[in-house]
Structures are given as structure tokens and as C-alpha cells.
């Protein structure tokens, strides 16, 4: 079986090898973090391409996890998976309520503000988790009012007025001078 790259969603990253028996250190992007191990199979994006792997054992280790990839039984084999993104097929992710979005759905959307008349601020390049609320990182581009990077709190109803995935836009109430 193969998965199209467009159907894959990054859910974590293999950061390093762990020990000599083929274990790897894993950083999870899921919330809660151990949800990462509920998804099967993993598609690992290495410098050699995308490969399907199965995890046969995993456990917490510090602020991350360590995992064993089935069939990878020594440190040298595990080394080939370091610095690799972990992805799963999009349809494995739980359905969200109306008005809720996965971060990867928001990345790449154009952001417009209604402050002082509709103006393009740029494109969402990533999101940050701050504890209080998530933050959109919006980078200005050739079509926006300037090239600045802006950090806009993702607070629906207050700063984020609407998200339209079909038209690939987010409408915000945000002063462009901030």
C-alpha cells in the first residue's frame, strides 16, 4: 500500500537514536502527546523517500517518547530514520466539531484583516502553542501590504472572524501596525 503525500499529515518527528537495539526518540505533535501511538501505520518521510513503518513498542522518556520500529534492531538501521517526519493518513484523524481545525489545515491560508478596510497581511506559515491560546504566524508576501511577520492570537470571535478552507482565507480583526 502507498499513500499519496497530499493525504498525509505530520504528527511527529523522529529526533535521534536511543540505545543500541534500534530504538528512536520521538517528538509528538499530537494532543495529548501519546495519541501519536494510536495511529497505524506511520509513514516516515526520510531523505530517501516515504516509507511505511509499524511501531511494536513505545514508552515515555523525559518530555518525549522512545519507540521501536518493527524490524529495526540495531543503532545503525535506526540512524536512517533520524530527522524524519512522522505522518499518518488524514482519514485516521478524528472528525472535529464545526469551527475547529487541525493546524495543518490553517497553514498556507491567506490572512486578511478588516481593520481599516480589507487588507492582505500574508500567509500562515505555522502556528505556535503558547498555553493561553494558539498563535498564527503570518508572513507577509508579494501580495500583502508589507513583508512583515505578524503573530496573531487564534481567538475565534475576537481576533479570528472566519476561516474559509474552500477559498483558503482567514479573516481577522487585527491592526496591521501590530
From Swiss-Prot:
Chief location of this protein within or outside the cell: cytoplasm
UniProt keyword list: Chaperone, Cytoplasm, Ribosome biogenesis, rRNA processing
Keyword S-adenosyl-L-methionine: no
Compartments, as annotated in UniProt: Cytoplasm
Protein family (similarity comment): Belongs to the RimM family.
Gene Ontology MF terms: ribosome binding
Subunit structure: Binds ribosomal protein uS19.
Record comment regarding domains: The PRC barrel domain binds ribosomal protein uS19.
Signal peptide positions (record): none
Gene responsible for this protein: rimM
Protein name, entry field: Ribosome maturation factor RimM
Biological process, per Gene Ontology: ribosomal small subunit biogenesis; rRNA processing
Domain PRC barrel: 98-178
